[in-house]
Amino acid sequence: MLTINIEKQLGQLQLKVNTQLPLRGVTAVFGRSGAGKTSLVNLLGGLTTPDKGEISLGDTLLFKHKTVNLPPEKRRIGYVFQEARLFPHYSVKGNLTYGMRHQSPALFDRIVQLLGLEKHLRSYPSTLSGGEKQRVAIGRALLTSPQMLLMDEPLASLDLPRKRELLPYLQTLAQELKLPIIYVSHSLDEILQLADHMLVLHQGHIIAQGPLTDVWNSEQMRPWVPLQELSSLICARIADRHPDYPMTRLVMDDGNQLWVSGQLPQTHKQVKVRIQANHVSVCTAEPKRSSIRNVLKGKIKELYPSDNDEQVQLKIALGNDELWANITLWACDELQLVAGKEIYAQIKGVTMTQMDIAQSH
């Protein structure tokens, strides 16, 4: 485990974190600007020093107040910043090999192949796109043979096309490398595609932490997501494709099924599906002959009126999964919706696109 128990005063912000994070998969650190996300990873990487406490990476003590403070180069931690920070006078190959702990042609070839850098090895940073530069920066960090990788909003400085270019490479790294990654981001799109675990920071303190789906669907996330962007994550398995239409059938743990747009590959693969709360409607009786392809039987767990009393957020239990729905107060009153009532949630298949579906690692 990555064990963190530290305090640090940063101007008006007091960062106080006491937690353990798994040494596997991708842990997303989420929060608003100024929450302490970058400050936390700087403390983990040794770029700044806690005022008190300790940090351990597995059995290795990285920091203990007044006793141990390993410098960054001794921590075996790779760091990828928002900007690539490449050496302009070095070629791509020179940047990649800078800081390699051991000359390993096999490791070099694997990282170059995973990041798609084969044709760029003789190029210089000035000739690369923003996404290509970040791939080189990621490769350089990995070639130092780290025990953990810190990534501080690596897509933040890129435009949308470059983000879409780089994201598949990050997905591949997350799946192929047995290396824990701490990934700082304020983008839920990135977190959906990459993360296994999630930690939410607010004013220097942890307000939620755990498996991605648990945190994403939790009440603690509601204040940090605009009402129109509230969504749920559902775990499902790719079952099959429709024989006549470009749709794919997913099966949830409770037996409910979802039809989503497009033809997904890899039958039987586990996936996470994002469903926007504004795309969910509710019936108290099973609808017949509807154009809506997805009708899920569930039970209302909680009701949360919005601040303006115009809408109500319903939390619906679907077996082991939970689903958020935004409806009007009028509809809630007319249907006499209360906690414990069985309902049918309707979701249009066309509202769930490829960007709303991510493989489970």
Curated annotation (Swiss-Prot):
InterPro entries the UniProt entry points to: AAA+_ATPase, ABC_transporter-like_ATP-bd, ABC_transporter-like_CS, Mo/tungstate-bd_C_term_dom, ModC_ABC_ATP-bd, Molybdenum_import_ModC, Mop_domain, P-loop_NTPase
GO annotations of cellular component type: plasma membrane
Broad class of where this protein is predominantly found: membrane
Cysteines paired by S-S bonds: none
Topology within the bilayer: Peripheral membrane protein
MF GO annotations: ABC-type molybdate transporter activity; ATP binding; ATP hydrolysis activity
EC class of the enzyme, as a word: translocase
Keyword Kinase listed: no
EC number: 7.3.2.5
Domain ABC transporter, chain residue ranges per copy: 1-228
Catalytic activity: molybdate(out) + ATP + H2O = molybdate(in) + ADP + phosphate + H(+)
Entry-linked PANTHER family: ABC TRANSPORTER I FAMILY MEMBER 10
Quaternary assembly: The complex is composed of two ATP-binding proteins (ModC), two transmembrane proteins (ModB) and a solute-binding protein (ModA).
Function noted in UniProt: Part of the ABC transporter complex ModABC involved in molybdenum import. Responsible for energy coupling to the transport system.
Protein name in UniProt: Molybdenum import ATP-binding protein ModC
Gene that encodes it: modC
